[in-house]
């Protein structure tokens, strides 16, 4: 277990592999290409409020990595290997996940995804074209999150806050949306095949179409 305060450092590839790091600050640090598989970060700050910059994790191996109660705002997570990653109770506003892989390819046509991103602020984060199928993605804040071409099919998105969220941009078929604040969801323009809603949400969405729900 270690506690550190690093500024502007390029992180060596194996420096933190499998380690547990608590209550540390990493300002403007470069984790690009680092092996962070199985590494656990608890209560760490990766966002420098003065410069308003996050850390660079691009192309890093984050397989089974854990971030709990961390500030990952504005982090660059492009093209990471993120199979089995856990991001819980974090701030990740404006972070960039384009090209991130949460999947295990078994053959060219069969794969599964694994990720646990929960109780996290994902406002204005970029998940364009990211595949997060059948993953645990509950109780997150998705305000203005960029999801063009993303697929969340079969994932648990329950308890989420989806204000200023473009439902038409992403695949949310077979998702659990119960107990979520659904923002501007218009059921006429979104494929909701297999989606789970609670009765309150269903009546709200029907009322938007001018249908009176009785009882």
From Swiss-Prot:
Q: Does this entry carry the keyword Transferase?
A: no
Q: Name one Pfam family in it.
A: Pentapeptide_4
Q: Give the similarity note.
A: Belongs to the pentapeptide repeat protein family.
Give any extra note attached to this record.
The gene for this protein has been isolated from plasmids in multiple Enterobacteriaceae. For experiments in situ it was cloned from E.cloacae strain HM05-184 but tested in E.coli.
Question: Could you tell me which species this protein originates from?
Answer: Escherichia coli
Protein purpose: Probably plays a role in resistance to quinolone antibiotics. Only inhibits ATP-dependent DNA supercoiling by E.coli gyrase at high concentration (30 uM). Protects E.coli gyrase supercoiling activity from inhibition by fluoroquinolones (ciprofloxacin) at 0.1 uM, does not protect M.tuberculosis gyrase activity.
What superkingdom heads the lineage? Answer: Bacteria
Q: Does Repeat count among this protein's keywords?
A: yes
Name the chain's protein.
Pentapeptide repeat protein QnrB4
Gene designation per UniProt = qnrB4
Could you state one GO biological process linked to this protein? response to antibiotic
The record's Gene3D superfamilies line, in alphabetical order, gives:
E3 ubiquitin-protein ligase SopA (2.160.20.80)
The entry's keywords = Antibiotic resistance, Plasmid, Repeat
